[in-house]
């Protein structure tokens, strides 16, 4: 369901010098132990211009750990480790792939669901379901230029049916992936509406070639990048993201992600809904030089063990499923799960599905975000073995705080101050 919210309580992104708040350490909640040196948001004026996008369920999505991990490697242009590449090849050869993020024949029921966001493009509006991705900066879609052999039931954008579409002369786009595949095409300017807010002249990248990994995702019609515009791939002139184009129409240049475990979440643009989180919001600075929402975590904690202080540079990425961290962190975590091991036949860490899985906490300054153990159990790969939601970032070169982590908190992406805000919330 898609709707526009215009009269929610808005909290200013301007912060005070002190903050206090509750600490949440239970495996059933996301914890933010809020210290006095962190920043709190005071109540502000009524929000004037903002909107909400509620995700929609994709009923055919079933989790596959190896394929989710492989997708992250491809996205960040990293070669797949040999073990993982072999697993992906075997799954593909066996015909077990129903989607790029996969399903495993031995476990056909749904374990979690990918959620997409409806976006209207053109006049009259053509509705496509897109993946909101803070790890990229292109709004690209399947289109009538995409060969039939590269489509698999996706809804396509047809610029010829939009009275507001115009071809951007000489402009092309291309995104390459770590497995050597790519997606590319031409560019149109058109009206794009998200959550009831319309912007004109938005760059819409129409695919004429699509990577097989996207072709197999039959319900995914494209991506809406929410990274910084400096990594947009349009040539010869980069184009702005939808968020950057819409900034001038928003009360505040920010959006929030309130993703959920096993149900649809939502994105709010232009305002912070005070009812969506508990306690206060802790902010940390963002390094946008590489176009990502990149921040430095202050460390980690496994279950009730002591917090380990360690600077870990990572990206808050709504377009990546798993939590990918350095090997030392990963091995420390799985050493606390009976029967856990690196399984070369799966290309990642697995453990008995019956095992007790501890929570995982990461630091944001002096605050703490706790991911429940139930979130860390990503999906079964057999009737008795499960694939972990935490995997190694080896070969990628940076840590990725994907949906496994983001679902455990209310997250603010402030494009004005270039900060990420983290707050506790009630978890499902």
Where do the language-model regions lie?
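Signature of the N-terminal lobe/flap region of pepsin-like aspartyl proteases
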Residues: 101, 109-208, 336, 361, ...
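Disordered propeptide/prodomain
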Residues: 20-128, 284, 414
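Short hydrophobic beta-strand that contains or immediately precedes a catalytic carboxylate
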Residues: 114, 119-121, 128-132, 139-141, ...
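Extracytoplasmic, non-cytosolic globular domains
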Residues: 273, 312-353
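Classical eukaryotic N-terminal signal peptides for Sec-dependent ER targeting/secretion
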Residues: 1-29
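Aspartic protease core domain of the pepsin/retropepsin superfamily
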Residues: 194-290, 383-428
